[in-house]
Amino acid sequence: MYDNKFSEDVGSFFRSPVREIFKRVDLNAIYSFAGGYPSADTFPLEEIRQTMSDVIGKYGGQAFQYGATQGVMQLRQAVAERYSVPVERVQITSSSQQGIDVCTRVLVDPGDVILTSSPSYLGALQSLRSYRADIRG
């Protein structure tokens, strides 16, 4: 009934293979590296707690506000200084997947041939498919 209301590109959206894996696996019964699901025991909770306390102590509620889309300026400046590049050329992303998606959006046109290894990172393949790349590998 509503199929004709969606954009033409909606057909390029695929179900997440990682989500499909998670549906079929009892994540408490195994240590699976298939979906990037580390053991909860490996998280440095005390260090995270202390870091959060330090950040809140220094920045208060401002730490939880939206920031610049290119990333927090202090972090961008530190990265620019470390790698001797102009700060205007530094983009901070919130995850590797966001970085892959931004790069794909900027660099890949529909129909561009992209050579990949097999197997490849599923998140990258999804991003490439959503921008209608011709994936070979």
Language model segments and positions:
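Conserved core of the PLP fold type I
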Residues: 59-137
